[in-house]
A protein has these predicted regions:
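C-terminal, well-structured catalytic/ligand-binding subdomain of enzymes
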Residues: 1-115
Length: 115
């Protein structure tokens, strides 16, 4: 399978990046008024994938997402809302909501719910 990141920039331009992971910052450089919060988490994902030579199990990826997840704040807007691991081979996904990494929902990308 193929994964991309699609960015809608403030000037209306759309950018597409061949990328298998993303955190909440723009990959496009020099976007006016764009926060860079999340870049450190993005870099940790990238370094881990380089170290693992791009091969990780779903459990390893979810564990990495647990490490980089943002804890709850008073505003409850900056915390990690969800983490998703997609398996592009068998077209399934795993979702952890509000950092509950021990309570993962499984689903199929073809619409069938997995047990």
């Amino acid at each position: 399978g193929k994964a991309v990141v699609l960015e809608y920039l403030p000037n209306g331009q759309r950018m597409v990046y061949d990328q298998n992971y993303v955190t909440n910052f723009y990959l496009t450089e020099n976007v006016p008024y764009a926060p860079v919060r999340g870049k450190d988490r993005y870099d940790l994902i990238e370094q881990t994938l380089i170290f693992k030579k791009g091969v990780m199990s779903e459990a390893e990826v979810m564990a990495l997402l647990a490490v980089i997840g943002q804890p709850e704040t008073e505003e409850a807007t900056s915390m990690t809302q969800w983490s998703v691991v997609y398996n592009l081979t068998d077209l399934t996904g795993r979702v952890a909501v509000v950092r509950e990494y021990d309570n993962v929902f499984r689903f199929s990308l073809d619409g069938m719910i997995q047990p």
